Amino acid sequence: MKENLFLFFDDKNKLSRNGFERKLGKPKVVEIYKDPNAYTAIGFPAIWYDEDKGKYHMFYNGYVDGKCAPLAAISDDGIHFTPRNTASESGLKNPFAPNQIMEGCGELANVYVDLKAPKSERLKALVTYGDSKTTRIINDPLYTSADGIRWLRQPVQWHNHAAEPGAMAFYNPVLDKHTIIARPDAGVRRIGLIETSDFKTFSDIRLVMTPDSLDEPLAEHYGMPTFPYENYFIGFLWIFHVPNVRERKYYKGTVDAQLVYSYNGTNFNRTLREPFFTNYDAPETKGMVYPSSMYVNREGRLLVAASASENEHGYFKDKGVIAIYELRKDGFISLHTEDSGDVITIPMLYRGGDIKVNLKAEHCSCALYTDDSDKKPLNLLTHELIPLEDFTHENCEEFSGDTLCWSLRWKKGDLESLNGKIIYIELKVKKGEVYSIKGNLTPMMICDLARYHLHGIVPDITGIG
């Protein structure tokens, strides 16, 4: 049975919590990559790990002598990159830089790794091409490649209007479709969504995110790279903080990123209206930071590649680096307590295996409860929590320290004896933070219990099925 991960973006799966506050994780810059020939303030890097050769490849835009070109770099560990000599390998005639991958294609919006495609077309380059005379984007071609060196233009347009660099794609297993996140049209700073099953036909773009009344005054949404993460989809919403002047919103103003998330890859929710990737992580990021690729390297490190610049918006061609951030596994948002806190989940259908907690705490214990819903499935409003005698806080093998995976254990109780039962999980934490709970668990809302006990129906946590 597939395990489910429970992050703390919201309280949907909690019955009660006391003494906790939500706290954003802290991605840390672990490396700064500077292209020797290009400025990459709006490089929007994409990372591909070539399992056959054991190498990480980074594709990005760079300005070389004021001209934009799609470029590539290579790495052994996904952190330390060097330019890849792609221009000579692919036989480019007049490259701007030795690590250029294509000529005359326009700007690189994103390179997507399509694991469902034949190997010859596994890399999909979403490109935007503009008319230099009118400065208007006139088409959005698609290129494919097997190796990231030789690219073939396909006879399709991936956007039915006009996108811009900063678009990206991900696979949605809930719908079994590829999803492209892009602007609804050129210059329209809102977030749209396109779906395709085969990269031959594409849906019309539909709006999924736009500034609201809780955003700071005048803020605009610049892009929203999104990534499947266990049973979630996690996005980095680029926020353009524009100056309060009566002029066109282009020159000056900083860019940072806030967290968004989805259970189904279609409907997205905001989290804390605070920067997750801030402008003060490194001197090179004080003007703009655009996280555009999230990946786990072979060592299990959760990494994010981002374009960054000390310049503010509109000044793209004379500065820019690519920052590599590291983030704690599941370390997006925690439940944090400076003193003591307790949290108990809603009822969960437990189907065997370990229950694991990612946390850092001076002290933590766990107790399990059940209820009488199996005996009174239609008595929806008065289910009583019943302590499980061998799974109390007193019997828990308590934890102190910092771990990505604390497997719950009790001195007497055998967790497997509860397989198939409804349980509630209660954590008591002293001075610490909890990042996630993971296990063969399905959350059961009030009517789900009746449907399960009467008809054996297990709810679909995505909200689509």
Where in the sequence are the language-model features?
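Carbohydrate-active catalytic/glycan-binding domains of CAZyme proteins
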Residues: 1-465
